[in-house]
């Protein structure tokens, strides 16, 4: 099917899609919307929101969910369940419910967060509830025009390359985008049937407890922290974890807002995104600035040095964390202790690990 055929087919889907597509007069934009399907990989789906096969919308989300559901049904016997969550981005909640409905239509029980939550809480739910898989609706630190669909396995980790390729084969076997919602009932109907179960309070409490259990340093500290969630999901859980610390929150960026009105891109590793945080840090004479992206799986760190705030790179932050963890655990290290690094991570953390006598695996 060529681009024009795809375009004309999508005009028949629903009134809103038709209206949006008819408003597009630029042939190059039409081509960009339909020249390929939105790619599914180890990071799931990610793209600009809008109508078209190369966009994030209800149909591409539904198709991905249907393919993922069919993959799970072939892989597992007995009752299958998935955990689903979303961040603060535009349309995230709608995409979460779209996914939930499709999974439920395939006989898969869905545990859906009723509040926006960070990615780690989705991974936690997948394990805590003994789910076979998880889905997070988010585009991480991308600009407001984007959204995405991250897929997780039963361990709460993103799909590995081989699994992602297999899921993709199921997705690609679905030719008709408009058919993904055939015989799919409403969210309320699936809730009544017990196929969609809303979750939040218990999982939030258990997650916070699990995070605090990992702490290696519980002594009182005079450290003053500035924190910004950058309009994302981190505000409530991060403040809860740090409730016994001195924390100043950037008020202008405190509330969830998918338009991210105070930043161009909500990437905490970009100094521009931490401008307000650094201004507050100077006002409060804080020691450190922490910022998290919308789905709260990325942290930016700025530390006070000679009266100025220096933004650390991810590699620098990681190396400091490695040094801290190994220092605190040095008495329990042995000949089998191992540090695992990715190929895109600098050697600094690995060298620190070796200095403590650890084996290093890449």
Identify the role of each PLM range.
Residues 73-77, 102-111, 129-133, 177, ...:
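Secondary-structure transition/capping motifs at alpha-helix termini
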């Amino acid at each position: 099917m060529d681009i024009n055929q795809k375009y004309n087919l999508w005009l028949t889907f629903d009134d809103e899609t038709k209206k949006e597509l008819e408003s597009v007069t630029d042939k190059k934009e039409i081509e960009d919307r339909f020249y390929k399907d939105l790619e599914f990989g180890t990071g799931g789906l990610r793209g600009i929101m809008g109508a078209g096969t190369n966009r994030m919308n209800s149909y591409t989300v539904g198709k991905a969910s249907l393919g993922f559901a069919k993959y799970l049904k072939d892989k597992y016997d007995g009752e299958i369940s998935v955990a689903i969550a979303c961040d603060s981005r535009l349309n995230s909640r709608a995409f979460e419910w779209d996914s939930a409905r499709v999974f439920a239509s395939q006989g898969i029980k869905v545990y859906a967060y009723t509040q926006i939550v960070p990615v780690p809480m989705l991974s936690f739910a997948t394990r805590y509830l003994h789910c076979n898989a998880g889905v997070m609706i988010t585009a991480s630190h991308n600009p407001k025009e984007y959204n995405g669909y991250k897929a997780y396995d039963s361990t709460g980790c993103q799909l590995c390359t081989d699994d992602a390729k297999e899921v993709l084969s199921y997705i690609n076997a679905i030719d008709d985008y408009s058919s993904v919602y055939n015989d799919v009932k409403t969210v309320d109907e699936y809730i009544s049937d017990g196929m969609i179960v809303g979750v939040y309070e218990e999982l939030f409490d258990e997650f916070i407890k699990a995070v605090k259990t990992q702490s290696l340093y519980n002594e009182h500290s005079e450290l003053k922290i500035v924190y910004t969630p950058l309009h994302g999901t981190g505000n409530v859980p991060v403040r809860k974890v740090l409730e016994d610390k001195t924390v100043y929150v950037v008020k202008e960026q405190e509330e969830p807002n998918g338009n991210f009105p105070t930043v161009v891109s909500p990437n905490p590793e970009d100094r521009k995104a931490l401008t307000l945080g650094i201004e507050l840090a100077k006002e409060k004479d804080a020691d450190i600035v922490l910022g998290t992206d919308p789905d709260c799986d990325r942290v930016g760190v700025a530390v006070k040095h000679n009266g100025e705030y220096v933004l650390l790179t991810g590699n620098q932050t990681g190396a400091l964390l490695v040094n801290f963890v190994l220092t605190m655990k040095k008495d329990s290290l042995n000949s089998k202790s191992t540090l695992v690094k990715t190929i895109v991570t600098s050697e600094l953390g690995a060298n620190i690990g070796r200095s403590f006598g650890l084996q290093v695996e890449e």
